[in-house]
Amino acid sequence: IGSGFGGLAAAIRTQAKGYEVTLLEMRDKPGGRAYVFEDKGFTYDAGPTIVTVPFVLDELAEIAGVKLEDYVKIVPCDPFYRIYFNDGRVFDYRGDQDKLEAEIAKFNPADVEGYRGFQADSRRVFDRAFTDLADHSFDRFTEMVKVAPDLLKLRAEQSVFKRVSSFIQDPSLRMVFSFEPLLIGGNPLNCSSIYSMIHYLEKTWGVHFAMGGTGALVNGLV
C-alpha cells in the first residue's frame, strides 16, 4: 500500500521472491512524497530531487535481476550545490576535499579547521545512527528506551544548525553546512542534529540526479 520509494522497494523485493504483487496508490500516479506534477510543458518535483545513497538503488536492481541503467540514468552532480547569497557571493559545495576547503577559505580561512571537526562528527553520527540503528525497530516504547543513551551521546536533542555552529563561526558557512534538512522538509533550526550525517553521506557517495527528474526514477522502479 503506497507507491513511495518505500512501497516500491518493498514491492520489488517481494516480487523478486516470486510473489505476485499489487501496488495500491491513492493518487493519480506513483511516487508518494516523490510525486511530480506538470504545468505548461514543465515537470516539477514536489518532493525529493537528488539521490545521496545510489547504492540502495543498485541493490534493488540486483535483487530484481536487472541493470538500473536500463531503466533510468543517474548522473553525479559537480558541484553538489551552488549556493547564492544576498550579497552576491557564491559557494560551490563540492565533493573534492581540497576544492571544498578552498571554498570555505574564501569565506573564513579560520573555519577550515572547524569544518574538519564537523566532518569527523558527521561521520561519527553516521556510524551510529545510520549503520547501527537504521534497521532498529522502534515500534515499542521499550525499544526506544534502549537506544536513548546512544541518542544522548550523539546530542540528538540539538538542532542541526546548533551542532554546525559549534564547529563553524562564519554565519554564511553555518547556513551552507546545515541546510540539508530542507531537502526532507525539515527546519535546520529545530531538526535533530542526527541529520548532520547527511553531510557524510554526500561526501562518501556523492550527490546524484536522475535524468528526467525524480519522476523518471519512480517510473524506472515501477
Task: Tell where the protein language model's regions lie, with residue ranges.
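N-terminal glycine-rich phosphate/pyrophosphate-binding loop and immediately adjacent elements
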Residues: I1-R124
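Helical element adjacent to the flavin cofactor pocket in flavoenzyme catalytic cores
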Residues: R155, M197-V222
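Rossmann-like flavin
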Residues: N86-C191
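Active-site-proximal loop/short-helix segments
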Residues: N190-I198
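A short glycine/serine-rich beta->alpha loop
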Residues: D39-T43, L182-G185, W205-H208
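Alpha-helix capping and helix-loop boundary segments enriched in small/acidic/polar residues
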Residues: P48, L189, H208-G212
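Alpha-helical scaffold segments in soluble metabolic enzymes
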Residues: V56-E59, I63, E103, K162-S166, ...
